[in-house]
Structures are given as structure tokens and as C-alpha cells.
């Protein structure tokens, strides 16, 4: 039997601002990764893997931090790299689910701030 505990948090205004910025960075990485993956497939017919192709482009992993200084996404280094990597992994899982005939999942869509999906 699985059990769950619900916890309600009440962040201070500074903490709420930091959390909103972190969520925005994760949303940006997910949507940008989706754009990169769709563009590479449409233009070149290549499927990109998150570990070898997408993470170095966005420089979200710790081992790619040297790229962050020189990239236009240098602002991402202010945020938690594990959460950013998880966004890329979640996108890869969404693609796997999309092409699995048993699951009948829809194609991944871009994320928006207020819950509606762009597509």
C-alpha cells in the first residue's frame, strides 16, 4: 500500500520569487529542448538524445558548465542544474510515451506559464 503526505508550504516573498524564477527556467529548458528536437528532426531527419545532444546545447548539466559562460543561456547557471536536467529527461520520456502505441499519448507540447499548452 502506498501512502502520501500532503504538505502546504508558505514561502516568504523572496522564496516565492526564487521558486517562480526556478519554475520559469525549467519551463524554458523544456520548451527550448522541444524546439531543438523538433527542428533537428524536421530539417535533418535526426533524432536527438537528451544526454549527448540536448544537454550540451543548453549546458544544463554540471559537467557542461564551462559552456554556460559563453552561451546565450548563461543565465541558466543561476538555477538548480538537477531540475533543468530533469526537464530534458521528462521531455525524452514524453517522446517515448508518444511513440509507444500502448500508451496512446499525444505529441509533447510547449509549456506556458499559466497552464495552457502551446502547440
UniProtKB/Swiss-Prot annotation:
Pfam families (alphabetical): HTH_OrfB_IS605
InterPro entries: Transposase_put_HTH (IPR021027)
Highest taxon of source: Bacteria
Keywords: Plasmid, Virulence
Function: Expressed but non-essential protein, involved in the virulence of Salmonellas.
Note: In Salmonella spp. the spv gene cluster is encoded on a highly transmissible plasmid.
Name of this protein: Virulence protein VsdF
Gene designation per UniProt: vsdF
